[in-house]
């Protein structure tokens, strides 16, 4: 029978980490607070990707599109429409979810690699529109100096907003992963054929997963706007998709919090190695090679296994 | 309950099922036998929708289900197990069956209730009925082959089928496991009153449990009748049983 106990230790961990993040701006310089916000929202983005990648087994090769769409939607609504500010924050993730639905509708007809390839091409299409449509999206310049609500621009407003929204989003995604839908999704990842045979409409669930992942990526996009007050086409360029894919693999794509960890490692690496050399991708390449050879389950996956949490069977989500 | 008429399916010119005819009445245990490559598994794939037929009809409770998607057919009440173990290997035994139950109860799009609190009793009941209750927390991929085959059946039971299709339920099992599987099939048809359609190479098992037997050869139905009549059918003996075997049995 499944474990029914409430894990007290786990609750303490969550509260401790939460408190740490809350107090962070008190003793860290401004730059590091900004960096933490960046890690949080990138982690949220990576976790949303992992929802379909690690838990759904879908080759989500162009996840950045939903992130970019979320960011651009908010940016455009804030700069070009007279709508109340907060409607933008609600509408942007929904628009991402709709884009997820449309792209998903076309892509889930194919499986595995073909799914990924088609997604890259459709996503690049969205990127090309944004990149070229100067009069509306600002083209390759993007949009800068986006007017944000006052509460977000004072002191550490953006940081706290990012922290709260990320925490809520992570909690919701955690619930989703452990819900009947999440469990079904993992079953589909393991064996789609058998799922069909037990009455599960596989494509419909994959589409639902795509919409959910798009939604949360959209939230991450709005957070980016909150922190940076600008958007540019790189937010939905395929290289970013690759980066967040690596974050999932690096942190452990068969764990829930792995992508968060992966994002932290990547963002920190990029920031600090980037100071010394512009060839930071070279370091990344070496890290990746080491990862593939020595930690195929990612950092968190390996820690769990070493700690005896892993059951020896890859991909049994317990954290 | 199930009626298959003149079913045909070819793969790239190879006629896998040429003319299959089959009838299964409610509560009956029917076996399909035939040499390797006779088209038994393809026939099952056709009935459960994994493969769609070129022509012919499959009536289930009077409704033609030929060409429907597997999940639609499953929802109509036909569930199956596979010849090669086909389970969710990374999940626990419990979760394997629970997912099937969730699918049956249409809960799979529920995103907010914790799954670990759901359907515990129902899942354990099914595991109990097949004798896997003690292993419910094990990762299914780590079970023995025999247990995995039994889990196959347990997953199929999750959808509360009216017709249970078993594709070689004892393939690769040890003699003890086979005896247990036979006991399980007896219980399913006796206690639960399930209609069972299965194919099997173990003739002893077939003749001990099947009420009617359908014999296939080269994709065609030779005969469907009671075990005694099948045994005495000359055509069957020549085609499949190599003569003599059954008269000894």
Language model features with spans:
Chain B
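Glycine-rich phosphate-binding loops of nucleotide-dependent enzymes
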Residues: 1-249
